[in-house]
């Protein structure tokens, strides 16, 4: 592991307070504070900090470069420090501590200012000496997940940290004049990147750049637009650092000493996306513009990454789905009935997705099979080879496409017949035909029957009845079959027999009374009935014989009374004897 630039026993205030990363409000306040306290804002305490850093660089040019080892004994560390360096660093720390910082404002400072000891002043000065030109290492949970930019002023053992992303090199104070000019040119290129539409890239803090940056701050405030008014501290690394702390190689550091800013710019690798984090988890969740608009093809992922503009919009991997998926424009094409050649060409071109299963070929419905008109007289004629080939080619066509191959005729239009009085009725419609599949099955069944007697033509045959009668017994359930065969006629038969029996009994009893002799005697008796007596003095007429009978008057309609009911002649109607 590479040594840390600051003591390991000191915890950063962001590490001590883990809820800083979990609270969106704290993150928002931190970004706002970093933006307000950026290098472009003309604050008094920031100007003093920059001036102190410049003084440190000027003093360091007169002294040999510090040793890159961070964990030195206290005796060597105290012995190597110079009074000029310690004095400038102490003045810088005191000036920064005098101002208010975000950790102090929020109450997140972990180190109390009263915890310092007088004997540790030399150690603090040496820490400032080592951290002046070294990159600031962020906490482990902040390196990939949340990279807060801007100046972070933390009161940790009296050390002031600048959060500018620094280059991967050490020994910055011992730099040549040519390197200084290269740094200035790279800084001018980075300053020009604040224009609108610029994508953030890696920004490098190089010693000797503070003077040029301080002069640019005044001119940039007046020229920058709203999109370019953001602080340069927001420019952060757009890619993950490929090298971890334990994989840092000294050869790469030496190569970066000559041109530190150019190496940082070369690491960009061209224009990168505007949002990129150092964690794979954030890469999966960070929104990148254009991700939701790219069309991906499941069947060919490699070709979709290379050229997504020429891929199919609705890919389907199944041949069965390809056959049934609706494609716009297929049913809107106008087809000419007389142009069979063009229809066959279209059918051959559209037959690109054959069914892979024999089961689907047998059961999948193809439009046009039931509308094909076949002549009954041509059933025996052989089928041409060309027609067979064209039919085989159209068997694989899509169901939605309307092909005219293999002699398929257009279905007849809907017919309506109007019968008007006094006009000749329309001819009868043709009988509906079976679908093509059923016609083929019937043809296969009728084929052996036609070949039984080939000498006799079809139209010359006569109907012959066989003398041998075959009786087929129908096996049915007794209960339901008998109940169905009975019906109401059985009840009618019972009633009819009952009524006939009653009629016979009545005729047997009334038969003697209906004879002509009995009828004559009855009329005679009715004719000889006595009239009612008006008075008692009138003599009663004697009964006359049948020869003396006179025609019966029409007034007498009552039958003759029985002999027992005839009153005696001497009995008066009034109940008195005469």
From Swiss-Prot:
Residues 279-375 are annotated as: 3 X approximate repeats. The modification Phosphotyrosine is found at residues 236, 365, 419. GO terms for biological process: apoptotic process; cellular response to antibiotic; cellular response to calcium ion starvation; cellular response to carbohydrate stimulus; cellular response to cordycepin; cellular response to desipramine; cellular response to gold(3+); cellular response to hypoxia. One of its GO terms (molecular function) is protein phosphatase binding. Induction: By lipopolysaccharide. It comes from Rattus norvegicus. The gene is Ppp1r15a. InterPro entries: PPP1R15, Prot_Pase1_reg-su15A/B_C. One of its GO terms (cellular component) is endoplasmic reticulum. It is found in: Endoplasmic reticulum membrane; Mitochondrion outer membrane. Recruits the serine/threonine-protein phosphatase PPP1CA to prevents excessive phosphorylation of the translation initiation factor eIF-2A/EIF2S1, thereby reversing the shut-off of protein synthesis initiated by stress-inducible kinases and facilitating recovery of cells from stress. Down-regulates the TGF-beta signaling pathway by promoting dephosphorylation of TGFB1 by PP1. May promote apoptosis by inducing TP53 phosphorylation on 'Ser-15'. Plays an essential role in autophagy by tuning translation during starvation, thus enabling lysosomal biogenesis and a sustained autophagic flux. This is Protein phosphatase 1 regulatory subunit 15A. It is a peripheral membrane protein. Residues 319-417 are annotated as: Interaction with SMAD7. Interacts with PPP1CA. Interacts with EIF2S1. Interacts with PCNA. Interacts with LYN and KMT2A/MLL1. Interacts with PPP1R1A and SMARCB1. Interacts with SMAD7. Interacts with BAG1. Interacts with NOX4. Residues 443-490 are annotated as: Interaction with SMARCB1. Residues 292-306, 331-347 have a biased composition (Acidic residues).
